[in-house]
Amino acid sequence: MMPRKEAKRIDIALQGGGAHGAFTWGVLDRLLDDDRLEIVGVSGTSAGAMNATALIQGLASGGRAAAQALLRDFWSQVSAAARLSPIQRTFFDMLAGRWSLDLSPSFVVSQQLQRMFSPYQLNLLDINPLRDIVAAFYDFDIVNRAEDHKLFLSATNVRTGLPKVFRQPEISADALMASACLPFLFRAVEIDGEAYWDGGYMGNPPLFPLIDETDVRDTVIIQINPFERRELPKTAYEIENRLNEITFNASLIKELRAAYFLAEIIRHEGLEREAYRDARLHRIEAQQEMRKFSVSSKLNAEWPFLEHLH
């Protein structure tokens, strides 16, 4: 009988993307099914931060099955809350099998209002249904005490414009909300006197905390936003959508380039591996599939759509 091989230790970096984060949930489900892999460190941004925190909490509290159950529970709660949203698909979109919200009158109106008013003017009560889910769903004591797993969540410091990476033991509901704070929809999240917006602007997802602060060489990036689109955007809305994708991929491209140059320096200069580790980066994506969905579908958390992405 052949001796069983030791599990391959990996880090995982999870990109943000609203409801499209259900794609990441599906990938994580399959990685957790594979006992040849051992997840050590996880980083995440926005929806990726939500997935990452559920993953770490589940692994720390009950192992792989618990992590899978928590991820499903989180997305089911998001979907249930979304049923109360005024922004829904039109009847014609449902008939045509389109997941986009582009034709939804309430979505169109909300887009126009966001161009004229800030959330400080429109959302006077600072209502955010996701905040209630996050506060009730996660057990941050378990997350922050997870000794065998490291967690890194990114946000953008509004004042300095620099990335902020939250680590254990500072993971909290506010840290998660900061990582997912889209400034056109919600007020900045304030933590210890600093204001934060969505981490996607500066680290989507953050790679170097995993490279620097874990002893794992292999990092798996789960990418949501497509790098490429074949069609040239021509309408104002198409241009805005493409700019959204480019913006939220820019930080990932920069970190990938930096990791490549670091690896080249290590190979050519003969630096000690103890000081500089030659990271191996892997990417899981579904660009052909994700290109089919407009940016507005990131706000569509209907359960059939989430299951389709999963």
List where the protein language model places each region.
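Gly/Ala-rich beta-loop-alpha elbow adjacent to hydrolase catalytic centers
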Residues: 44, 48
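Patatin-like phospholipase
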Residues: 1-43, 53-310
